[in-house]
Amino acid sequence: MLRKEAFLNGSSNILGINLDGERLLVVYGSPTGIIYERLSAPVPAQVSFSAVLELIMVQADRLLTLTQAQHLPVPDRVSAAISGNLDAETGILGSAVDFPLWKQEPVRSQLSLRFNLPVVIEQKANAGALAEYYFGGGQGVRNLVFIGMTPTLRAGILTNGRLYHNSGGTAGQLGSLRLAGDGPAGLGKPGSLTGFASAAGMLELAFKRCPQHWENDVDLFQIIRDAQNGDPYAQEVFAEAGTQLGRGLAPLVHLLQPELIIIGFPGCLLADIFANPARAALAAATDLAESALPRLIPSPLCARLPELEAIAPAIHRIKTQSAE
C-alpha cells in the first residue's frame, strides 16, 4: 500500500494499469507521456476479480521496487484502462466478455483502497482515444474516433475535444453491429464487426479462410508478420477484415462526421495492408465525396498504445482540472 504522506510535494507521477483478459500491464509514467518502467504478465483464464486484484498488487510492488531503486518519486495517483462494460463515473465494471466471472465489480474503489491513492479509470477504447489525443495522431484534432480492437471492437469518441461516454459511462460497443448472417465471432456474435475486425476475430477469420495454412497454435502476431512479409493468404485475410471495418464505420461517419478515425492495436501494425481496404470500403459505403470523408490512419503510437492507454485517463483528469 502506498501512503499519501510519503509523496513529494508537487509531484505528478502515475502508476498506470492496462488490463484485459489476456494481459496485465503496469507502468510508471509522467503527465508528459514518458514511461520510465513497465512490467507485463499474462492473465489466467476464468479468473476471479479478487485474484486479478492480487495480481495487480504483486506486479505493482515489483514495478515500484524498480522505480525506487532509480530514486524516482512515489506515484501520487493511479490510472487504469480496463476492458469490458466499465462505467467511468461509478468505477464499476458491470460485465466483460473476457472476464466472464466478473459481475458488478467495484474496480475503482478497490484499487483506491489497496493503493491508498486517487484512481482515475476508463474503458480501454476511451483510454486509447485519450492517448491519441494527447500524444498520437489526434493531437490538434477536436473530433476523432479511436477504434479499440481488444477484446471486442469499441469506439472511443472525442467530440469538440470532449470525451464521450454513453449512458452506461463507457465506450461505444461498435462491434455488436452485424455485417453478415454468419462468419467469425471473436468474443462477439458470428458475423459481427467484432467477429471480423477485432484481434480475436481476425485470428478466427484466418483459420476460417485458410484452415490448412497455419498451425493450430499460431497467434495473431505471427499472421501479422506473415502479412508484412508478403504472404498473400495473410494479406487477403486482413484485407477482408479491413473491408468489413470500413463498412461498419459508415453509420458512425454519417452520424458524427469526425475529422479522423484511428485504428488501434494490433491493427495498426498492419499499416496500409489493413487501412487501405478499410478506406475503400468506407468510401463506398458512405458514398461521400473524398473531401467529406474523415482521414483513416493506423495509430502512429501503435506498439506504445498499451502503455500510454494506462496513464492517459489520469493525464486527462490533470489537464481538464487545470483548465477549469
Where on the chain are the PLM-derived regions?
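ATP-binding/phosphotransfer module of carbohydrate and carboxylate kinases, centering on a glycine-rich
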Residues: 1-74, 88-90, 113-115, 135-137, ...
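Short glycine-aspartate micro-motif
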Residues: 14-18, 75-79, 143-148, 154-156
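A cytosolic small-molecule/anion-sensing beta-strand core signal
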Residues: 31, 82, 159-160
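Hydrophobic "anchor" residues
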Residues: 34-35, 93, 163-164
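Short hydrophobic alpha-helix segments
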Residues: 38-41, 97, 167
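Active-site neighborhood for divalent-cation/phosphate handling
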Residues: 86, 108-139
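A charged helix-plus-loop insertion that forms the helical arch/lid used to bind
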Residues: 93-100
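Glycine-rich phosphate-binding loop of actin/hexokinase-like ATP-binding domains
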Residues: 140-197
